[in-house]
């Protein structure tokens, strides 16, 4: 329109991009002066594959007993290297957060003080940090506390809290709607998590986040806190793995018409070995008739030693054409036991 635009000096900090100036002009001249013509042609709107996957994630968590929370992305300045905003209204909201777990821990702590016996929460939000430039990263964060199976029931004076494997299973169930594989890699590099009960979450070979129990020092600092598990997953990596074009191609298998045969095996392993590696070895050895293998029990005791732990696996055998007998699986089952003993320097427990 041939206008001359002058920016008032005390407003110039709000005007950085071209679109900021366009919005300012629109506000000043009045939105009623814009044409009401709709774009032509009008196309029907639809959700993208990423948006659909994100909805599945939220539904998966709520269906598994989690509550979605929204925490404030503006935080007060502290000793950490936070990104300051140029025009804060309050000192308490003068910086952009670089994590979400602290607020989630406060939410859990408030619930514990209020007498709640469990608290399962999740949030999809942004964090901000600076490398050579300002980075905005979208994360799926959450916290797990307490065992909803028991509620307020007193279990003969025993601790009703979830153990590490049960809590990790809760996260696995919530994300099962995406039908992706998430591997766990033990780590002790996250300072606010327990060094022996923390794992990096690996998706398609990428470091996507973490899952772990809070560090004992946090429980000591906040007297009311108890055993809490925190998790964080990069949303871009999560959605990227779940929206591959070949991910949702249906594959149909014939329903089995013959029964399966199950056998349990129990070994004492050094803690340095990963369960995923053990299961992979079992699958590889028994691939002809072995249909499935999964962990059913974990046992820790001082008699085993501090560096050792007992795992029990359930193996399912099935032949698609006939009912199996003991003699059909004896050789394969024995071979699996021998291979596990040799590969992981262990012995079968009676």
Give residue spans per PLM region.
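Short, hydrophobic beta-strand segments
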Residues: 2-12, 36-49, 83-90, 136-158, ...
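Short, glycine-/Ser/Thr-/acidic-enriched flexible segments
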Residues: 3, 9-13, 74-76, 90-91, ...
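Conserved alpha/beta core surface patches that mediate binding of polyanionic ligands
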Residues: 20, 68-69, 98-145, 216, ...
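A glycine-rich, aromatic-flanked flexible loop/lid motif
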Residues: 25-33, 75-77, 132-147, 241-258, ...
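Charged/polar, low-hydrophobicity segments characteristic of intrinsically disordered regions
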Residues: 57, 133-142, 175, 344-350
């Amino acid at each position: 329109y041939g206008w001359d635009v002058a920016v008032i000096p005390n407003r110039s900090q709000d005007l950085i991009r071209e679109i900021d100036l366009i919005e300012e002009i629109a506000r000043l001249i009045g939105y009623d002066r814009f044409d009401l013509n709709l774009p032509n042609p009008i196309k029907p709107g639809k959700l993208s594959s990423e948006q659909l996957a994100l909805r599945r994630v939220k539904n998966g968590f709520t269906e598994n007993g989690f509550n979605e929370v929204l925490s404030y992305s503006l935080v007060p300045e502290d000793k950490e290297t936070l990104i300051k905003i140029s025009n804060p209204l309050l000192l308490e909201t003068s910086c952009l957060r670089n994590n979400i777990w602290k607020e989630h821990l406060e939410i859990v702590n408030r619930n514990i003080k209020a007498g709640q016996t469990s608290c399962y929460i999740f949030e999809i939000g942004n964090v901000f940090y600076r490398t050579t430039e300002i980075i905005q990263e979208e994360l799926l964060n959450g916290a797990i506390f307490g065992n909803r199976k028991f509620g307020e029931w007193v279990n003969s004076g025993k601790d009703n809290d979830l153990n590490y494997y049960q809590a990790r299973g809760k996260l696995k169930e919530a994300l099962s709607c995406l039908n992706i594989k998430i591997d766990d890699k033990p780590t002790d590099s996250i300072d606010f998590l327990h060094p022996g009960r923390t794992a990096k979450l690996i998706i398609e070979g990428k470091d996507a986040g973490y899952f772990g129990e809070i560090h004992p020092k946090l429980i000591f600092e906040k007297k009311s806190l108890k055993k809490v598990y925190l998790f964080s997953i990069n949303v871009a990596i999560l959605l990227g793995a779940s929206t591959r074009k070949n991910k949702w191609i249906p594959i149909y298998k014939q329903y089995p018409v013959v029964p399966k045969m199950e056998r349990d095996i129990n070994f004492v392993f050094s803690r340095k070995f990963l369960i995923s590696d053990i299961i992979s070895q079992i699958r590889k050895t028994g691939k002809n008739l072995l249909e499935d293998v999964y962990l059913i029990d974990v046992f820790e005791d001082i008699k085993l030693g501090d560096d050792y732990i007992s795992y029990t696996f359930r193996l399912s055998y099935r032949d698609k054409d006939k009912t199996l007998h003991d003699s059909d699986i004896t050789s394969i089952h024995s071979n699996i036991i021998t291979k596990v003993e040799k590969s992981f320097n262990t012995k079968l427990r009676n």
